[in-house]
């Protein structure tokens, strides 16, 4: 047990400080604090289901990337998303089981992860710092994941945002991703 002659004052001060901070956070809007957006900027951009989006990845040595993909190491690339360019974006192959199975099946179309702030501090896509592109190589319909995410959101269960993207690498078609 803590024994200090001023412990009551210290604990009382900590409680008052906690109550003051709680009050500030509860009534922050009245004091001019802005709440976090319920719909971040990227939700209406890339995750708009009204169309298939385009993502062009500009990579210096794509063959070397594919060869080293199982290592899951980031390389720099330029990502052009719906015509908007983002420089020095981190790119790596994504997955654990899917990465292993892609290798096992002899495929080269990996799921990908983009990290906008990997090389540039504060880099983001309309507030989003990471983006996963799912190759859906085990789903020929490309619908299972999309349907599950939308059903979860419809039922009020937190679910990732998703939409379809046509991905090209250095201008060459690479396929449809989710």
Residue ranges and their predicted role:
Residues 1-178:
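Phosphate/dinucleotide-binding and metal-coordinating scaffold of catalytic cores
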